[in-house]
């Protein structure tokens, strides 16, 4: 499949978010894969959870993964414009919509959540702006927003401006 992100948990477990193209699909069918796969620290497959769709534990592009200090798995479900939160066995705990259409997510040791939105516009997410949202992984509160850098110089993909696809710390 098309892995989007890999996260290694504190115990060494490996989580993989799959599939990138599902964010562009509206219905189940060929290529409509949306799941998280879990592997042991030595790479042995343990389980998969999630499927393509719009409901809890369903994904349209699990694009980025992060883990908070409690060991909760945060999945940036970009095609559904939300974060879904799970325990490490795949039990759905919560869904947050206030961080927009996330391309990358990072949670620091103090549970500060950084979510980069590189795609919101009138086509992909009307009413939202590209940029970095910073908030609490404990409560879901968004504290601040840093808008995208707008440039008059063309970028490598032919557009204008600059916006991150992930979060590097």
Stretches with model-predicted labels:
Residues 1-169:
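Eukaryotic scaffold repeat domains enriched in small/polar residues
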């Amino acid at each position: 499949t098309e892995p989007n992100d890999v996260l290694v948990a504190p115990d060494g477990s490996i989580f993989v978010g799959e599939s990138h193209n599902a964010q562009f699909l509206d219905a189940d069918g060929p290529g409509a894969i949306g799941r998280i796969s879990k592997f042991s620290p030595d790479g042995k497959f343990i389980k998969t959870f999630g499927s393509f769709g719009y409901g809890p534990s369903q994904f349209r592009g699990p694009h980025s993964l992060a883990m908070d200090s409690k060991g909760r798995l945060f999945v940036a479900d970009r095609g559904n414009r939300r974060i879904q939160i799970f325990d490490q066995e795949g039990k759905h705990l919560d869904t947050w919509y206030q961080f927009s259409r996330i391309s990358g997510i990072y949670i620091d040791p103090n549970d500060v959540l950084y979510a980069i939105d590189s795609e919101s516009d009138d086509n992909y997410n009307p009413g939202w702006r590209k940029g970095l949202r910073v908030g609490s992984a404990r409560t879901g509160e968004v504290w601040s927003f840093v808008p995208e850098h707008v440039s008059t110089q063309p970028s490598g993909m032919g557009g204008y401006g600059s916006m991150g696809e992930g979060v590097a710390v």
